[in-house]
Regions:
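Proline/Glycine/Serine-rich low-complexity intrinsically disordered segments
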Residues: 1-142
Length: 142
């Protein structure tokens, strides 16, 4: 039976769940309420592989990043089945994903400014959005 949406971890009781090896999300899910879901969790080499398990019908849910789920769906262009993506908040997991950024040595302000300007230009011209869409991803502002 397919899951339409997940609002809390208890919605996953008695469901097969795929997760990414070594991820904080996997640890949080397996440790939730003293291991409530631990026996239902299977670990895969990465989040995209975990998400693919749901697409093939082998698993009921995958606890992965939105980008990983979208990438797995995008790769299956042959399957028009609509898939529901739900946000699930767990203690120890960032509710809006992990913030990412560009790191530049503190004394290289010129490079930092150039990178910031380049990214701003890509965003303003819509090129960043097109890049994300070309890979089946949603561009979310930080």
């Amino acid at each position: 039976q397919r899951i339409n949406s997940v609002y809390n971890p208890e919605d996953l009781i008695e469901r097969k769940i795929a997760v990414e090896q070594g991820s904080g999300a996997a640890s949080a899910l397996m440790g939730y309420k003293g291991g409530l879901l631990r026996n239902q969790v299977s670990i895969f080499k990465d989040g995209i592989e975990a998400a693919k398990q749901v697409l093939t019908g082998a698993f009921d849910a995958a606890f992965v990043s939105r980008a990983q789920a979208e990438a797995a769906i995008f790769e299956r262009k042959d399957n028009p089945t609509p898939w529901a993506l739900s946000s699930l908040t767990l203690p120890g997991v960032m509710p809006n994903g992990w913030p990412l950024g560009l790191a530049v040595k503190a004394d290289n302000k010129e490079l930092a400014t150039a990178l910031d300007n380049a990214l701003t230009t890509l965003r303003e011209r819509g090129e960043l959005l097109r890049l994300f869409k070309s890979h089946g991803l949603t561009l979310a502002a930080p």
